[in-house]
Amino acid sequence: MSSARSFAARRGLYGGGVGLALLLASCATPPPARTLACSDALAPDIVRSADGTKASTTLKVLTFNIEGLGFPARSGRAAELKQIGDRLAAMRAAGTGPDVILFQEMFSGAAKNAVAASTYPAIASGPRRTTKASGPAPEALPGKAKLKRGEVGMHVTGSGLAIASRYPVLSTQMRAYGKRACAGIDCLANKGIMLARIAIPGVPTPVDIYDTHMNSKGASKAPEPRHLAAHDRQALEASEFIDSTHDDAFPVILGGDFNMRHSESRWENFSKYQSLNLVHRVCADQASGCEVRMSWDGDEPWMDTQDLQFFWDGSLTSIRPIRVEALFDGSPDSPQLSDHDGFMVTYRLEWPTSADQTPTC
């Protein structure tokens, strides 16, 4: 082996030229962006209660990590990603698709094209590669940064986040997680959290919808104390971002890939900062009235997945999950096209008919 090749090997899979390859691949295709005028938005079906005092509608939200890593981290994904975009477009055309999709790992050109091919009229993306983190840098993480596991002090791709909606997006905000809030290979992506404020015609308030992708565990190649501390800092930053951007009058939904499967320590840390209602916990209670159309094992099904959704009422418009189901899970009519299943929640939004019906956009 030549000395040059030996040096490249010592740098590890994600060092040197590999990082450059990821950078070039991520820059080749810009993330999709679309806006929908309020005048062009179609209103959902709105139902009034028998006594006429309440009105309600439903909102279907899908969170989906589409495994859109670029070469050389992944290869041969273009066909599956194209199927994802085509199937989402077909579901939307048939009226069976989600109203809002929270995407993660929209890194490669094929992944960005898949999101665009979903045909949703409003699409916004999260932190870009060059989006700066905010706030003072905390102390260093436990252990030492290692070049061979991607802790190179720079990002080679953006966050991979995107939100697609059938309804207008009134505004967006985003936050990249801090430089000392990532561990291992995850540091190559500028992970963070984003907000899309959605206006639903006929609903008296917007809905604040957040999307995030948090630091992985073993896949990060970082030691546990280091990746656990990074995840804890991201949980705190996500909570701070929601607190600073959310309007208490509006219902809130938080979804994404939280990388907390089978990790009591991550759940414990996350719960210190986040008091939103967990959809899995609510729907696991048979008395909740939430229909479960997926396979759940044990008393704590949220421990068996990375893909989660949380929610909270607004002061005027309430929200609760009424159905959960898996998409792209390998069932006969929904082939598995990613290393994650899609997790779709149908929420019921409800408000008093006496509420001010001033258009939200």
Segments predicted by a language model, with ranges:
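Surface-exposed intrinsically disordered loops and tails
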Residues: T130-G150, K179, A183, H227-A229, ...
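Beta-strand-turn-beta hairpins that frame and shape the catalytic cleft
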Residues: R48-V61, L161-S171, L188-N215, Y347-L349
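Bacterial N-terminal signal peptides that target proteins for export
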Residues: S3-G17
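Surface-exposed cleft-lining segments at the edges of enzyme active sites
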Residues: L69-A73, A176-I185, M214-A229
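Active-site beta-strand/loop signature of hydrolases that rely on acidic residues for catalysis
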Residues: K60-I66, I84-K112, A164, A196, ...
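Active-site-proximal segments of metal-dependent phosphoesterases and phosphodiesterases across multiple
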Residues: M214-A238, H262-K272
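Metal-dependent phosphoester-hydrolase catalytic domains
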Residues: T29-S49, E240-I253, F258-C361
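N-terminal, active-site-proximal structural segment of metallo-dependent hydrolase catalytic domains
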Residues: G15, G19-L20, L24-S118, P127-K148, ...
